[in-house]
């Protein structure tokens, strides 16, 4: 239930495969082999987009601008999954054994494959 936890980890994962839900999307997108971190950190996975907040209706409006997740080139996110996690992302600073790999954001709530629908 998105209203019980105000923040939800938000990440681009390595794979766009959602055949087994979010379990098949792989780890966070990390083409440069860095540790997990906050979106503004120098040392972070490219797919680390921090947290989003959903309203009481469960809807979150998200607008992301980030130089580490381009739509073209070697580090393109096209074809990868964008995942909303049930728990907040501790941004690599929580001291938990998973902080430096996943932000300890645990299970996924929902996912979607990311792609270009058309060119305008």
From Swiss-Prot:
* Keywords (A to Z) from UniProt: Antioxidant, Copper, Cytoplasm, Disulfide bond, Metal-binding, Oxidoreductase, Zinc
Which Cys pairs does UniProt list as disulfide-bonded?
A: 22-112
Q: Region Disordered: what ranges?
A: 16-52
Any idea which GO molecular function terms this record carries?
A: copper ion binding; superoxide dismutase activity
Q: Please give the Pfam families that the UniProt record associates with this protein.
A: Sod_Cu
Q: Where in the cell is it found?
A: Cytoplasm
Q: Which InterPro entries match?
A: SOD-like_Cu/Zn_dom_sf, SOD_Cu/Zn_/chaperone, SOD_Cu/Zn_BS, SOD_Cu_Zn_dom
Basic and acidic residues: bias regions:
33-47
The protein's name in its UniProt record: Superoxide dismutase [Cu-Zn]
Self-association or partners: how does it assemble?
A: Homodimer.
The protein's organism comes out as: Aspergillus japonicus
Q: Which residues bind Zn(2+)?
A: 28, 36, 45, 48
Name the reaction it catalyses: 2 superoxide + 2 H(+) = H2O2 + O2
Question: Which enzyme class, named as a word?
Answer: oxidoreductase
The taxonomic lineage of its organism, from the top, reads: Eukaryota, Fungi, Dikarya, Ascomycota, Pezizomycotina
Cofactor binding summary note: Binds 1 copper ion per subunit. Binds 1 zinc ion per subunit.
Which Enzyme Commission number(s) are listed? 1.15.1.1
Can you supply one Gene Ontology CC term for this chain's record? cytoplasm
User: Can you tell me which residues bind Cu cation?
Assistant: 11, 13, 28, 85
What does this gene product do?
Answer: Destroys radicals which are normally produced within the cells and which are toxic to biological systems.
Family listed: Belongs to the Cu-Zn superoxide dismutase family.
